[in-house]
Structures are given as structure tokens and as C-alpha cells.
Amino acid sequence: MSRDSGNDSEVAVTHGEVQEITEENPEIGSMHITQETDISDAPETNTDSSRQRTESTTSVSSESWQNNDEMMSNLRRAQRLLDDGATPLQIIQQIFPDFNASRIATMSENAHFAILSDLLERAPVRQKLTNYNSLADAVELFKTKKHILVLTGAGVSVSCGIPDFRSKDGIYARLRSEFPDLPDPTAMFDIRYFRENPAPFYNFAREIFPGQFVPSVSHRFIKELETSGRLLRNYTQNIDTLEHQTGIKRVVECHGSFSKCTCTRCGQKYDGNEIREEVLAMRVAHCKRCEGVIKPNIVFFGEDLGREFHQHVTEDKHKVDLIVVIGSSLKVRPVALIPHCVDKNVPQILINRESLPHYNADIELLGNCDDIIRDICFSLGGSFTELITSYDSIMEQQGKTKSQKPSQNKRQLISQEDFLNICMKEKRNDDSSDEPTLKKPRMSVADDSMDSEKNNFQEIQKHKSEDDDDTRNSDDILKKIKHPRLLSITEMLHDNKCVAISAHQTVFPGAECSFDLETLKLVRDVHHETHCESSCGSSCSSNADSEANQLSRAQSLDDFVLSDEDRKNTIHLDLQRADSCDGDFQYELSETIDPETFSHLCEEMRI
């Protein structure tokens, strides 16, 4: 949890990215914790202490789409324990027994308050529906459902030439090197940082400015859902306006767009095209009236999200019969909470390059969004197949065809049984290669030997060589023990194939994952800088040659030796996202919270 931006709003920095939490958001807004001290005596919170996207306070009393009984119950229980004198660490241990509190025992109380706040705000764990699993199930859902809610992120625009944010080659990775003074990559969308230094934003803006790109297969698929009367709403986190370019009408641009701009000094309004020249030249656009900096009407951290979003979600949550998340990491609230606000029996599909540890979709289709959507379109047939043909024709006419020709028909599915047989074969081959080679026994020099001094020297060199071999073999074995063999799934996807690696996970080209032959589980490939792909301000080193970086097993607390300075209240928690390896730390915290601030923030969680 981080500081508020007013009496009616509340923010949390959890689950790897800044998340919007306000009193409009009764999941948090209904909560209340206060210490024995009068809340009126609580210190004013510092609006500069955290990045946030907050919603309009005008709809506080009317929006209740994020109610959650479990979170309410936990907060009330935390309130009682706090009133009884329990420490934040003790509260964590009692309310969240599955959380490994021993890992944070040596941290400061302020850090414990921050972690407790984050745990109380975490999105509820969604229970997977057992009757929806396979790619075929997904196709059937698209055929039969009539009120499909599609939530899209940057992944749907990658094939258009627009970089995403968190991949190894994404915008955040490049900002780290190009703007070393940037506190962290997400500061590019911090309204306070923008006012001080708009250059990083304008450096990035050129890459997604409207008018340069052709909508992707994924955009056209969503439009066809709308045309066929199946689309309830497209909630997009993107600001590239490609939904409008595609002709999608039932779209909510959750985070705004470049279509309109405003002077940050005098409020003069501009059309997005009026700053086109400056944006494409990577120059900061200035107001013609007062020379103030012009900002596109994109929702920055620290600005109102707007009322339209909440009104639509409140209406749609009761109508939706299928949720489809395409190309989003679901790390930014409140959009990330949409899958958790609908009826528990509504099936949900994830189409993304990687599995999301904080989101239990019923069906996971992992890989490049367009490759997956193409396969679904071929299965649906009719107008959906025609849109693929039309898209390919446009790309060919514009000379934008890829070196590797996209699939022209449905992919051949490697079944889960066949996949596991391949894994077992690979494991047997790997085990056989690990068998130690027999070496001849070392020969000692007999006392009565009359070998020359030269022979003695050769014998010593022979022993030394064998010892070196032993050392190398030991190192190799140790590596294999620490880092089990990973099977590259992408090698199986040639010749227009996809792989069912589990009952509910199907892998396509572009998936950022491998298969662990030891645990028989899917593991994420590491992006740039291991676990620094989100909004943490700490710097992290990346060792491309390290085998540990093959897995998403970002460092847990076991890997850290915290210095005395780290344990002070100013500690920048090295609790980065641990992804699939440690469920305790599927979020990150950017700062600590003192008890008074914790009390003040929780007071504002009530309706």
C-alpha cells in the first residue's frame, strides 16, 4: 500500500505493478483499520511518495463492482488484532498462515506494515472451473457465448510493430539503459515525474503514436466478435487507438489515448495530430499559448482514471458469460481486478506469452497472441477465416509480410500424452548422459621402480589431468542438481504445430516458457534483469550466462543477505516478484509504511 492522493482515494503497489485502489473500489473502500489513536491526528500523507492511477471521486458512492467478502473479513480481523496489541508480523502469521513469515522476521516493523497492507489488498484467488480446459473447449466457448468481455493489453499490438512494456526487448527494458536517471521505468507514466522531466515520455511516445500502424489479427478478431453480436465490451489498457482504427465500437480505453491533448499549465486543449511533428521528432511539445508542456490525455499515475470505466464494469459484470484476457500481464489495477469481479461460474481464457502466477484462468493459450488467434479463427471458420485471408492480403500489398509465413490452416496439436512421452524420452537421454565414465585406476610408482625422472613427471601430469576431469565433472553434476534440465517447447512447434503441455495449457510459438523435466511443470523464461520487469525502483544485475536465469525463479529471501542498512525503515524491499517459484511473494513493494500512515490509509478504506 502506498500514499493517498486525497481524502477519497487510496493506492496500493502490489502484484508487481502500481494498482489503483480508491473508495470507488469497495473491495478496498469498504475496509477499515484504525489504531487506538484518533485518526484525525494522523499525519497528512505524502502525495509524492508513490505512483498511482486514481479514479474520479465523483462516483465513489455509486461504484461497487469490486466488493469482496474475503478481503473484508481479513481486514476486520486485522483491525481486532491490531486493537489487541498484536504486531503486524503477528497479524500476518495469524491471518495468512500460508505466508512464510520467517523470511521477513528480521525486517523492520514499517516493512511488516507494508507487507501486511499488501496482503490485505491482494486480489482474491480465483478457483479454476474444472469443465473448461483445452484449446477445443476455448473454440467451443467462442462459438456459443454471446456476451464476451475481452480485456486487452500491449500483447495485441506487438505484431503491429509497437513494443510491449515488460518483455525482454520491451519499453521498460530500454528505458533503463537510455534514461539511467529514471527512478524506475514506470516513472515514465508518473505525472509528477512528467512535470519535472517529460523527455522520457516523449522519447517513448513516437513508438506508439497513432497513424503509423496497421491493426493486428487480434484487433480484427475482436471486431468480428462485435460484428457477429458476441462482444459485450473490449476493455483495453492500450493507448495506441488501434481499437478505433479497427472500427470497434464497444470499447473502453481504460488508460486514455493520444487522440486528445491538454496543456499542463493553462489547460488549453489540442487534437492529438497537432503534436504529431514533435512526437515523431522526439521533441517535447509545448503550448502555443503559454509554452507549457502538452500532455496527451493518457491516464498517468497520479491522475483520475475516470467514471466511464466504473460505470461500464458495474453494468457488464452481470451480463458477461465469458472473459478473455489477451496480451496483458494484469498488473495494473483496477483493470486487473475485472476477472475477479464476475460470477465465479463465468469461464475465463488467458491468451498471453506467459502464464500469470496471480491469475487462475480456466484455459491458458500461451504464445504470440496473433498465432493463437489465427488458430482459433481457422477453427471457428466462416467470417473468422475470411478476416485472416483479408489481413494477409493487406499485409502482402503493403510489403509487410514476415520472413516466416504465418500459418494458413489450423495447427496440428501435440497431445498431452504425446508431449509427456517426449519429455520422458528426453529425461532418459539426459539421465544416461549423466552416468559417470569409468576411469582406469591410478597407477602408483613402485618403490622398486627404476623409471626415469621423465616417467615420474608424466605420471604426475596424468594424475593432475584426471583430477581436473573430476573437478569439471563435479561442477557439471552440481549444476544439474541445482538447475534441472529444461526442455525447450518451441523446438516442437515447427511444421505448424502446438503443444498441450497440461490439461489446461496449450503452447504456441512465442511462448516465454520452458518445461522442467524434473518437476514436470512449466517454468517461465527470464526476461531482462530477472525480476526487475515491473515497478521496483531498485537496480538489479543480469547475468545472461547464468543458468539460474533460465528459470523465473527470481531471488527469494533465502538468496538475500540483508545488511543493517537494508533493515532500516528506508529499506527498498528486495521482495521482487517471485513469479512461479514462491507464492508468498507474487507482488512487490516499493516502499515501507510507518504505523501512523498504515492507520491513516486503512481508515480511508471504509465506505
Curated annotation (Swiss-Prot):
Enzyme class name: transferase
InterPro entries noted in UniProt: DHS-like_NAD/FAD-binding_dom, NAD-dep_sirtuin_deacylases, Sirtuin, Sirtuin_cat_small_dom_sf, Ssirtuin_cat_dom
Statement: the UniProt record of this protein carries the keyword Translocase: no
Deacetylase sirtuin-type domain residues: 128-401
Alphabetically ordered keywords of this record: Cytoplasm, Metal-binding, NAD, Nucleus, Transferase, Zinc
Region (Disordered), start-end ranges: 1-68, 426-453
Effect of deleting the gene: Reduces the longevity-extending effects of nicotinic acid when exposed to 1 mM nicotinic acid. Defective ascaroside-mediated responses with neither ascr#2 nor ascr#3 inducing lifespan extension or conferring thermotolerance. Reduced germ cell apoptosis in the gonadal arms following DNA damage induced by UV-irradiation. RNAi-mediated depletion results in an increase of 'Lys-16' acetylation of histone H4 (H4K16ac) on dosage-compensated X chromosomes in hermaphrodites.
GO biological process, one term: heterochromatin formation
Cofactor dependency: Zn(2+)
Extent of Low complexity compositional bias: 55-64
Record: residues binding Zn(2+): 263, 266, 287, 290
GO molecular function, one term: NAD+ binding
E.C. designation(s): 2.3.1.286
Binding of NAD(+), residues: 153-172, 237-240, 327-329, 352-354, 369
Cofactor note: Binds 1 zinc ion per subunit.
Gene3D superfamilies found in the cross-reference section: SIR2/SIRT2 'Small Domain, TPP-binding domain
Catalytic activity: N(6)-acetyl-L-lysyl-[protein] + NAD(+) + H2O = 2''-O-acetyl-ADP-D-ribose + nicotinamide + L-lysyl-[protein]
Cellular location(s): Nucleus; Cytoplasm
Oligomer status and interactors: Interacts with ftt-2 and par-5. Interacts with daf-16 following heat-shock, which causes daf-16 to accumulate in the nucleus. Interaction with daf-16 is promoted by ftt-2. Interacts with transcriptional coregulator hcf-1.
Database matches in PANTHER family: NAD-DEPENDENT PROTEIN DEACETYLASE SIRTUIN-1, NAD-DEPENDENT PROTEIN DEACYLASE SIRTUIN-5, MITOCHONDRIAL-RELATED
Function: NAD-dependent deacetylase. Involved in metabolism, apoptosis, response to oxidative stress, response to DNA damage, and determination of lifespan. Required for a reduction of the 'Lys-16' acetylation of histone H4 (H4K16ac) on dosage-compensated X chromosomes in hermaphrodites. Plays a role in germ cell and somatic cell apoptosis in response to DNA damage. Functions upstream of daf-16/Forkhead box protein O in the Insulin/IGF-1-like signaling (IIS) mediated pathway, promoting daf-16 mediated transcriptional activation and increased lifespan.
Protein name: NAD-dependent protein deacetylase sir-2.1
Species per Swiss-Prot/TrEMBL record: Caenorhabditis elegans
Classification of source organism: Eukaryota, Metazoa, Ecdysozoa, Nematoda, Chromadorea
Gene of this entry: sir-2.1
